[in-house]
Amino acid sequence: MSVLHLSIRNESDISEAVRQSRAMAGRLGFSTTSAYYIATAASELAANLWIHAGGGMITLQRHGARGMELMTVDNGPGIADIDKALEEGFSTANGLGCGLPGVKRLMDELDIASYPGVRTEIKARKWL
Amino acid sequence: MKVPIIRLGKVLLVSIQVDLTDAAALQFQEDLINRISETEALGVAIDITSLDVVDSYMARVINDTASMARLLGAEVVISGVQPFVALALVEMGRELINVDCVFNLEQALKKLEVSIAARGDRGGNRDTYEW
Ligand SMILES: Nc1ncnc2c1ncn2[C@@H]1O[C@H](COP(=O)(O)OP(=O)(O)O)[C@@H](O)[C@H]1O
Ligand SMILES: [Mg+2]
């Protein structure tokens, strides 16, 4: 299976996203290290859905011939200043603020689009 | 899910087996603080061998727990950080885990023994405790 939609409604859904993303990365041929990077990134993104957006959806999928994408979509309050959100240590929820900067380093590409109050979409990709 | 806390002489052993929810993390921290003051423990070994993926949230729970234990005068060592967990944490940046780490529980106990002995101060007064 190369597309998986997981709804993040409570804390235990986060671990499911972690498990599934690591398994999919393995099936797609990523090294164990890369699969751990992807799973850690999935954990950060799914946790953000739960903490900052009151839930949302994470989609795990193959991207092109040699990649994997983690995509989150939510209808929470959104991210007013994306550059700030990507800064090391910036958090509006008294967190460590290293989730998004961490995802950026763990993955090869990170795109964030946010229409505050309407929809936030985050895509993180990694290539084989 | 409760995190069991085992006493071994002047040291407490904790093994975190699964990702903790917010509520479970708070409960664990409270339990550990109570046990430290009850037993006047001088050291705490936190084993995370069973944790498969450690994100910044779990890293923070571990760090905060270690700081609390230190405030109560206990030395803290983390053991069992899995190699791939370590790689991912380093890649994420910052010193996400800010506590001394060793490979396994045995080394954790050795390290605690050494640092407790090095303090001399309180360890010496607690001659009722045995390993
Ligand atoms: N899905 C989201 N919806 C709204 N805001 C978000 C979302 N994801 C991240 N953010 C914002 O970006 C900030 C930085 O996120 P992150 O680096 O993961 O740090 P932390 O989660 O520790 O606050 C958050 O504090 C929050 O303001
Ligand atoms: Mg976060």
Located regions from the model:
Chain A
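Bergerat-fold GHKL ATPase/HATPase_c domain
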Residues: 1-40
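Conserved beta-strand-loop-beta-strand hairpin that lines the nucleotide-binding pocket
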Residues: 1-4, 46-128
